[in-house]
């Protein structure tokens, strides 16, 4: 992030060009993906806007056991279908500014379209995520964290409609 007065501004830009190579035992591969994430924050608040576009003849290829940094790779969906275009809006708040250190939250909405949906329909999907996290700041349970993640997906692709809740308990051990 780059501070400008009281504001903090930032951007992540990524471009992936994936092409087949060698004997093409897995078939042909032709994909490019552009990912843009811009954000502005002041005080406890941060607003993020993202755009992602998939081009070429295939969906974005994932290497086994890897997670690429692309803006719309989120809790359930990744918005990487062939020809998919997706937009994201996200709002974060850090409640330390309001006297509750350790409490953070965000809400995010991503919508994608332009791909082939089920039964030849024009593909459309969206995901809404809510994330609330609290880390104990002092006492015998210091650094113990609890996070609730809720995701709602609506899609006319093979995933369909899905609602998911995750409760994550973590404990951070300082090394220094």
What do the predicted segments below correspond to?
Residues 9-13, 36, 45-49, 89, ...:
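Transmembrane beta-strands of outer-membrane beta-barrel proteins
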Residues 89, 130-136, 161-176:
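Outer-membrane beta-barrel "beta-signal"
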Residues 7, 30-34, 83-87, 124-128, ...:
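Residues that define the transmembrane beta-barrel architecture of outer-membrane proteins
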Residues 15-19, 42-44, 51-57, 95, ...:
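Transmembrane beta-strands of outer-membrane beta-barrel pores
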Residues 54-120, 127-133, 137:
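C-terminal structural cap/anchor segments
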Residues 18-30, 59-64, 115-123, 156-163:
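Outer-membrane beta-barrel translocator domains and adjoining extracellular loop/strand segments
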Residues 2-9, 96-103, 137-146, 174-176:
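Short loop/turn motifs that connect adjacent beta-strands in outer-membrane beta-barrel proteins
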Residues 1, 38-41, 92-96, 133-137, ...:
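Transmembrane beta-barrel domains of outer membrane proteins
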């Amino acid at each position: 992030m780059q501070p400008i007065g009281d504001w903090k501004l930032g951007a992540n830009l990524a471009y992936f060009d994936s092409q087949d190579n060698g004997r093409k035992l897995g078939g042909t591969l032709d994909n490019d993906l552009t990912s843009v994430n811009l954000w502005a924050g002041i005080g406890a608040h941060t607003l993020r806007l993202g755009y992602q576009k998939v081009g070429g003849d295939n969906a974005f290829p994932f290497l086994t056991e890897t997670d690429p940094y692309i803006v719309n790779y989120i809790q359930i969906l990744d918005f990487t279908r062939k020809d998919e275009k997706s937009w994201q809006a996200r709002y974060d708040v850090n409640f330390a500014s309001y006297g509750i250190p350790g409490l953070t939250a965000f809400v995010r909405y991503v919508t994608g379209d332009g791909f082939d949906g089920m039964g030849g329909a024009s593909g459309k999907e969206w995901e809404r995520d809510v994330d609330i996290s609290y880390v104990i700041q002092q006492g015998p349970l210091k650094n113990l964290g609890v996070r609730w993640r809720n995701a709602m997906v609506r899609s006319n692709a093979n995933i369909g409609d899905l609602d998911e809740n995750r409760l994550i308990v973590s404990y951070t051990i300082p090394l220094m």
